[in-house]
Regions:
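C-terminal lobe/tail of nucleotide-utilizing enzymes
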Residues: 4-24, 189-267
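Conserved catalytic-core segment of NTP-binding enzymes
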Residues: 30, 56, 60-61, 139, ...
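Walker A/P-loop phosphate-binding motif and the immediately C-terminal alpha-helix
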Residues: 26-67
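Short histidine/acidic/glycine/proline-rich micro-motifs that form metal-
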Residues: 36, 115, 174, 199-202, ...
Length: 267
């Protein structure tokens, strides 16, 4: 049996969740990643972390690995001066870097500008599973979500080795689809991927055609309430719980939890 992950790309069902990536009993790592920037990656990361903590009552931590620190801003994180990279090169407890957020059961590890040098640091350290080892120390959490910087970099490779599931936002456009297929080729079937149509306007012919080509992909709509996150500094479900966007994030999170549960059963 196989499950389709992209048109022309399939993944064996036994890879529905990468059991080999599990760090502790019950813990799962979910990376939100895209080769391209500007596709709604941080929006997904914050809303999925909120759903994990509130809808599933999971002990959740969002680790912001993007030097732009957008997730850190949205969740009211307090970043130290150029400290985010230090956890990777020094003997610093990653758990002690966790900060509470205004959301119960949701903690945050903030980003800062020092992460711009993270790729070079990984090359220097030559430790292929450094990120995975640090995640493994987060034993107080059920779900670890990673807001990843764009690009096929050493940081991306570290993420791919550590993740149980990679969520990839894809804008309904040929360029975004092409970037997604490049990610699939790079992974080579080693890590399960969940593509998500993001920033969707069903009135646009291009978007409608893309959705028709991949009808099984979850869909996150283009929405003014999502844009309002930067003003509210909160997940959509916190300030617009009855919105279409909030329902879409809830449904996406249920899909993710189902995948994780199916993977645990297969293990």
């Amino acid at each position: 049996m196989t499950i389709s992950v992209a048109r022309g790309v399939v993944m064996p069902r036994h890879l529905a969740i990468g059991g080999a990536h599990r760090h502790a009993a019950g813990m799962a790592t979910i990376a939100i990643y895209s080769l391209k920037g500007g596709v709604g990656k941080t929006t997904l990361a914050v809303n999925l972390a909120w759903c994990s903590a509130t809808r599933s009552a999971r002990r959740t931590i969002l680790w912001d690995l993007d030097p732009q620190a957008a997730s850190s801003f949205l969740l009211h994180g307090t970043a130290g001066r150029d400290q985010a990279q230090a956890m990777f090169s020094r003997d610093i407890s990653v758990a002690k870097r966790a900060q509470p957020t205004p959301v119960a059961k949701l903690d945050l590890i903030t980003a800062d500008a020092s992460l711009r040098g993270l790729d070079q640091l990984f090359h220097t350290l030559d430790k292929k599973k450094r990120l995975g080892k640090l995640i493994g120390a987060l034993t107080d959490y059920d779900r670890v979500l990673l807001d990843c910087p764009p690009g096929l970099t050493e940081t991306a490779d570290q993420v791919m080795r550590a993740a149980d599931l990679i969520v990839v936002p894809v804008i309904p456009s040929p360029l975004s689809q092409r970037a997604y297929e490049e990610v699939i080729r790079h992974l080579g079937g080693k890590v399960p991927v969940l593509p998500v149509h993001a920033m969707v306007d069903r009135r646009r012919r291009l978007h409608a055609d893309a959705l028709a080509a991949n009808p099984d992909w979850p869909v996150i709509p283009m929405s003014s309430v999502i844009e309002a996150m930067t003003v509210q500094r909160a997940a959509v479900g916190a300030f617009a719980p009855r919105s279409t966007a909030a329902a879409a994030f809830d449904q996406l999170w249920r899909t993710i939890e189902h995948r994780l549960a199916a993977g645990s059963a297969a293990d």
